Swiss-Prot record:
Entry keyword set: Ribonucleoprotein, Ribosomal protein, RNA-binding, rRNA-binding
Protein name (database record): Large ribosomal subunit protein uL23
Top-level taxonomic group: Bacteria
InterPro entries: Nucleotide-bd_a/b_plait_sf (IPR012677), Ribosomal_uL23-like (IPR013025), Ribosomal_uL23/eL15/eS24_sf (IPR012678)
Gene Ontology BP terms: translation
UniProt keyword annotation of Ribonucleoprotein present: yes
Species of provenance: Desulforapulum autotrophicum (strain ATCC 43914 / DSM 3382 / VKM B-1955 / HRM2)
A molecular function GO annotation: structural constituent of ribosome
Its job: One of the early assembly proteins it binds 23S rRNA. One of the proteins that surrounds the polypeptide exit tunnel on the outside of the ribosome. Forms the main docking site for trigger factor binding to the ribosome.
Subunit (UniProt): Part of the 50S ribosomal subunit. Contacts protein L29, and trigger factor when it is bound to the ribosome.
Length: 95
């Protein structure tokens, strides 16, 4: 699996911004079949940083209803990546 197939997108919320500033942790949506080692190698290769730890979790899709039609959002996987002290990823700076 290629690095750009593993890392889908960064997750940018108030909570993840606080984690980024205080704990040097970045949150990503990743491929569901990727493991921690794959995610670590992909982050290190794409962003040229060193990773200290990776936490992953499966997020269940919510059931949504629009009128009488009931559907479900897809399940996805989230990874919280802790960078080594002194390392940074600057893709949201200046926004």
């Amino acid at each position: 699996m290629r690095e750009y197939d593993i890392i889908r997108r960064p997750i940018n919320t108030e909570k993840t911004n606080l984690q980024k500033e205080t704990d040097n942790q970045i949150t990503f949506e990743v491929a569901r079949d990727a493991n921690r080692v794959d995610i670590k190698n992909a982050i290190e290769k794409i962003f040229n940083t060193r990773v200290q730890a990776v936490k992953t979790m499966q997020v269940k899709g919510k059931v949504k209803q629009r009128g009488r039609i009931v559907g479900k959002r897809r399940n996805w996987k989230k990874a919280i990546v802790k960078l080594m002290p002194g390392q940074r990823i600057d893709f949201f700076e200046g926004v």
